[in-house]
Amino acid sequence: MASAFSPATAAPAASPALFSASTSRPLSLTAAAAAVSARIPSRRGFRRGRFTVCNVAAPSATQQEAKAAGAKESLRPVYPFAAIVGQDEMKLCLLLNVIDPKIGGVMIMGDRGTGKSTTVRSLVDLLPDIRVVVGDPFNSDPDDPEVMGPEVRERVLEGEKLPVVTAKITMVDLPLGATEDRVCGTIDIEKALTDGVKAFEPGLLAKANRGILYVDEVNLLDDHLVDVLLDSAASGWNTVEREGISISHPARFILIGSGNPEEGELRPQLLDRFGMHAQVGTVRDAELRVKIVEERARFDRDPKAFRESYLEEQDKLQQQISSARSNLGAVQIDHDLRVKISKVCAELNVDGLRGDIVTNRAAKALAALKGRDTVTVEDIATVIPNCLRHRLRKDPLESIDSGLLVVEKFYEVFT
């Protein structure tokens, strides 16, 4: 989805000199990371002040432990995406979101033990490379001001040449026990008021910028945290506000959630914010079940050899994704097909226009994945159940699955 903020509103323009909140004394630019304007509470109300934005100087023992744990986790072998047997609906939804992040993420619901988490985490190997500014906690894009952190934006305005490196798109796991401060980031209020320095420690949303944020068991996450995640995913920005001091930074990420419907459903308002919805069921075919068990046993026995056996398929799929991302802008969808998509949404009483927008985007992403520059009726038929089923109003007396209702209405309108 398009960002609701422009670079001008996201971070105020830089000034030649930075000043302390309490005095007019300039702050040292060597200690400053970025200039940000803030409203400071005083006896006479609020006044404006200029602050420096920086990371907390010395990481705590907890942060160092977390970093070490993250390094160990990255060394763990990941099950190859190409080796996942079945679950084509879930895999397609994930691939389409990687090709076009503006689809708005995917919610995966299904039985326990069906490979939801394994499939999502296996996506890591297929993610394309991106250019990022070296040492920036927000994974800033050196060429796009809208996805630059405040420090990088300030350096660009000063004409500094930024060191750039190519890195893989990151996937960040959000644990169920995460606090709001850990997710959004924290501001050291005492340091801000006494030293005039806005010491900001970025959270998981900053780390996930230009990447993927995965929430396992999202239906068990606190509602207010889900609201924060969905708002950031929709707007592309995260704002942290404490005691009248606020910081905004880019937070553009693909939100992927998974859960078991037996443990509780998400509120309809929250479900609607996910671009696509995939249903995962237990494989019933005996031959497929045996194949899954055997493949898993091979992976557990020798992960390295197992991954190497799928290297060619993985490379082919990665090239296909990279090509689709490059050609996505050239894909066209006929006006008549757009009208029919909107007619399906209207006749299904889908609230709002998110269903129309996401269906158009997903159909174009699928056409790009197949190497075409024109959307066909078959493309729309493939993606429309995943784009609309979670947006239908639930009728307790209705015995037909919502996905089947979408399919029935699709063929009624398109034939």
Swiss-Prot record:
InterPro entries: AAA+_ATPase, CHLI-like, ChlI/MoxR_AAA_lid, Mg_chelatase_ATPase-isu, Mg_chelatse_chII-like_cat_dom, P-loop_NTPase. Disulfide bonds join C93-C184, C345-C387. The keyword Cell cycle does not apply. GO terms for biological process: chlorophyll biosynthetic process; photosynthesis. Its EC number is 6.6.1.1. It catalyses: protoporphyrin IX + Mg(2+) + ATP + H2O = Mg-protoporphyrin IX + ADP + phosphate + 3 H(+). Keywords: ATP-binding, Chlorophyll biosynthesis, Chloroplast, Disulfide bond, Ligase, Nucleotide-binding, Photosynthesis, Plastid, Transit peptide. Gene3D superfamilies: Magnesium chelatase subunit I, C-Terminal domain, P-loop containing nucleotide triphosphate hydrolases. It is an enzyme of class 6 (ligase). Residues 1-67 form a transit peptide. Transmembrane segments: none annotated. GO terms for cellular component: chloroplast stroma. SMART domains: AAA. Its main location: plastid. Pfam families: AAA_lid_2, Mg_chelatase. It is found in: Plastid, Chloroplast. Pathway: Porphyrin-containing compound metabolism; chlorophyll biosynthesis. Redox regulation; active in reducing conditions, inactive in oxidizing conditions. Thioredoxins f and m mediate the reversible reductive activation of oxidized CHLI. Belongs to the Mg-chelatase subunits D/I family. Involved in chlorophyll biosynthesis. Catalyzes the insertion of magnesium ion into protoporphyrin IX to yield Mg-protoporphyrin IX. The reaction takes place in two steps, with an ATP-dependent activation followed by an ATP-dependent chelation step. This is Magnesium-chelatase subunit ChlI, chloroplastic. It comes from Oryza sativa subsp. indica (Rice). The gene is CHLI.
